[in-house]
Each structure stands twice: as structure tokens, then as C-alpha cells.
């Protein structure tokens, strides 16, 4: 389930880029509602932008990961986060799921008229770099330890 995946991220203290929640006061139904509102740009924190929260599952229905598609960039996202943040649960990494998740996220971006998507990763994350490059990422530069890549979505 999604809750089991969230618990795995918490237990392993693994980064869950593309998935945001408050573990202390978590209520699943409220999380769903907050994500629906965020897509419409409603009740989002200051300096956040409208975003679509996506989840990935395997064929058996096991939750695999998160992908957050920001529908526009602000100054912070232009420097650090980009249009898309993603992560795969720790027990399922190294199986190609991140590559497919990003591919599908880019298709959603295309449907939202995003022509070029900025996708970033830490200079310390070669696996994410490989995922971005496999999806057509073109390196632009590094800023504060964050590699920045542009992907033509058309």
C-alpha cells in the first residue's frame, strides 16, 4: 500500500523526493485532498507552485514511488528543484522503475503544455543522473551541488 511505502521511506530515513507528507500528523484522506488542492493551486504553502502528485505501482499493485510534477517554476525551483521530483521506495531501487516513472511523468508534463522540463539531481546521486540522461536530459550546469538538466518534452 501507499502507507507501507511511506513507512519504508521513514524507517530507512531515505529521501522521498517527489513525495511530501507530515509523518507526525498523517491522515491519508487529508493527504489526498491536499494533493488535489495543490494541483489546482489552492491552499499551497507560500513559495510553492501548483503541482500534480503521482504514485507508481507495479503490476501486482504494490506502491513503488512518488513523482511530483510542478506545473510552473518559481525562482527556487529554477535553481534547485525543477519541474519534476521523484523517488522509488528503497527496497525497489535499481530495477528501472525510476526511469519508467520519469518517462511517464514527462508524458503528463507534455499534456500540461510544458515544452521543456527541468529535472535536477544531487551531484552525489549517480543513479538519478543516469535516469535523467536515459530520458533525454541535456546537462546545463551545477548550482550549489545540484545538477540541472533540461528535457524536451515535445
Feature-to-residue mapping (PLM):
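Conserved catalytic-core motifs of GNAT/GCN5-like acyltransferases
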Residues: 120, 133-151
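GNAT-family acyltransferases
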Residues: 1-83, 108, 144-154
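Loop/helix-junction capping segments adjacent to catalytic residues or to phosphate/diphosphate-binding pockets
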Residues: 78, 95, 126
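Conserved acetyl-CoA-binding loop-helix of GNAT-fold acetyltransferases
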Residues: 85-88, 94-111, 129-134
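Conserved beta-strand-loop-alpha-helix junction that forms the acyl-donor binding cleft
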Residues: 119-129
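Conserved GNAT acetyl-CoA-binding A-motif
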Residues: 109-120
